[in-house]
Regions:
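Short beta-strand/loop motif that positions the catalytic acidic residue
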Residues: 304-306
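Primarily recognizes the serine-hydrolase "nucleophile elbow" in alpha/beta-hydrolase
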Residues: 127-182
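N-terminal cap/lid segment of alpha/beta-hydrolase-fold proteins
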Residues: 24-54, 274-277
Length: 379
């Protein structure tokens, strides 16, 4: 149960950052507090934290997928993950976006509006970095590819940076397989009921079904390819909500498993013969492809950091983006690193700080990080 609840907590942290924790201070912590500005721009709440000893650099932070609206109250201390940027002298600007869910379309515009507002109020930063977690990694890549004259570099943390149709179709394929093995546990897949929420109760119901049929659960896990049965219930619960939200967003069904051959499980023949097949509606599928399909035209350094045991956004999926930049001739501007952990976006604040230091050194001194494990702290 703790691991299932942990994934829900991780999703919350990805969306808005967790509350500051005194047990995990930055090694570079400032003694002077930052000034905080909050407000609303075109329906999107925002927050700007400006350190007292500002170095005139800016980090535009992109939060991840949010089921409920993100709150950015000025009275709360900045999340320890983001405090790493402040403690290095950078201002942090974060938008709550004007929509929840797969708000890639809105997030790009909302963050750009906030960045422009920051410049009007505080002057043009000497350099601007993009950074984000999960879906925020998607927005980080989009920002770097579309505005290389604006951003000096980017940091993608557990980012969903492969093509969205590839990522999201895989999520749907898992649900269709789950429905085959565990009929009646979920509601309809097309359309997903609008009132469904990925709560602890829904997770518990799915987890109980998995526990009752361990062979079927193992087959499902092999299809998914990452994590374990303890986290699979959380993944199914979240994916079911995500699929419904995207159906409502696109005013149709963007998902297709009609031509998919499931592999990896022992009973693949029976599954492929018996699973219910669905075809996507063209306009709905086109929306997902538009938001987003990376071009690979990466003209600024991008460091991606992933945890090897991420059950929600598999670490292997980031290689799709590595191939995109390779095809476009910009492979020198992309580096993938990892930490050997299980969970979605379970980096410590210090790990985020070290990754950001690597990115800054890459931009400032042309010290390209080495692909592989995140280097340990210097002693």
């Amino acid at each position: 149960m703790k691991r299932r609840i942990g994934l829900l907590i991780a999703l919350s942290c990805v969306a808005c950052g967790c509350s500051a924790q005194g047990s995990d201070p930055s090694p570079r912590a400032r003694t002077q507090p930052a000034s905080v500005e909050t407000g609303t721009l075109a329906g999107a709440d925002y927050r700007i934290d400006l350190p007292a000893d500002w170095n005139h650099g800016l980090v535009v932070w992109f939060h991840g997928y949010a089921v409920t609206p993100v709150q950015l109250p000025a009275r709360d201390p900045i999340a320890p993950q983001l405090r790493q940027f402040l403690d290095r002298g950078y201002a942090v600007a974060q938008s709550a976006y004007s929509a929840t869910g797969w708000a890639v379309e809105q997030g790009v515009a909302d963050a750009e509006r906030l960045r422009a507002h920051f410049g009007e109020k505080h002057g043009k930063p000497r350099e601007t970095f993009a950074a984000g977690m999960s879906m925020g990694g998607t927005l980080t890549v989009m920002s770097l590819e579309s505005a290389p004259d604006t951003y000096a570099g980017g940091l993608s943390l557990c980012g969903a940076i492969e093509r969205s149709d590839s990522l999201l179709q895989r999520d749907f394929a898992l649900l269709a397989a789950f429905d085959y093995y565990f009929p009646g546990v979920l509601g309809p897949l097309v359309p997903v009921p609008a009132n469904y929420l990925p709560t602890q109760a829904s997770e518990k119901q799915i987890a109980s079904a998995l526990a009752a049929k361990p062979d079927a659960a193992e087959s499902l896990l092999r299809i998914w390819g990452v994590g374990d049965v303890a986290t699979l219930g959380s993944v199914v619960a979240f994916n079911y909500y995500e699929v419904g939200e995207l159906q409502r967003r696109t005013h149709g069904n963007p998902f297709n498993n009609a031509d998919l051959i499931y592999t990896g499980n022992k009973d693949a023949f029976a599954l492929n013969a018996g699973v219910k097949r669905y075809r996507a509606e063209a306009a709905a599928a086109a929306y997902i492809a538009r938001w987003y399909t990376p071009s690979g035209k990466l003209l600024r350094p991008l460091l991606a950091l992933h945890d090897t045991g991420d059950p929600l956004v598999p670490a292997t999926a980031a290689f799709d983006y590595a191939l995109a930049v390779q095809r476009a001739g910009h492979a020198d501007n992309f580096v993938q690193q990892f930490v050997n952990k299980e969970g979605h976006c379970v980096f410590t604040p210090q790990e985020i700080g070290r990754a950001f230091d690597e990115l800054v050194a890459w931009v400032h001194d042309n010290k390209r990080p080495v692909s592989g494990p995140l280097p340990p702290p210097e002693r």
